[in-house]
Amino acid sequence: MGKLEKIEKCVQKGKEDELVKLVHDRDKNVRLAAIAGVGRAGKDNACNVLITLLLDDDPEIRSASASALGDLGDPRAHTLLMHHLGVEKDERVAASIKDAVGKLHGGG
């Protein structure tokens, strides 16, 4: 089974720990899929993991992390997303952060 298939299985079974390991994979496609998976199936540690990824050098990873935080729906993310919105220079990432904040307020 490939890593992308493994991610989907982990999402279905709610295996947050396995997904968290994969957000740091060398393959960017695996990372992006795992980040989305954490947003869909994350529980206890998901918010913290996704917030740290907002500091990643890659804007695509930051954008995916913001989107996943919106999908996760954890209200703890709101303040940190707003902070990152104030310092984010990439317009696509900023748009993802705005969308995530909207989801957290029930608009998504």
Language-model features: locations:
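Acidic (E/D-rich), amphipathic helical modules within compact regulatory domains
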Residues: 26-33, 37
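Amphipathic alpha-helical scaffolding segments comprising HEAT/armadillo-like alpha-solenoid repeats
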Residues: 10-24, 41-55, 74-86, 107-108
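Short inter-helical turns and helix N-cap capping residues of alpha-solenoid HEAT/ARM repeat scaffolds
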Residues: 26-27, 57-58, 89-90
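Core register positions within helices of long alpha-helical scaffolds
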Residues: 6-9, 37, 68-71, 75, ...
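N-terminal leader/linker segments that initiate helical-solenoid repeat arrays
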Residues: 1-13
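Eukaryotic acidic, Ser/Thr-rich intrinsically disordered low-complexity regions
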Residues: 86, 93-108
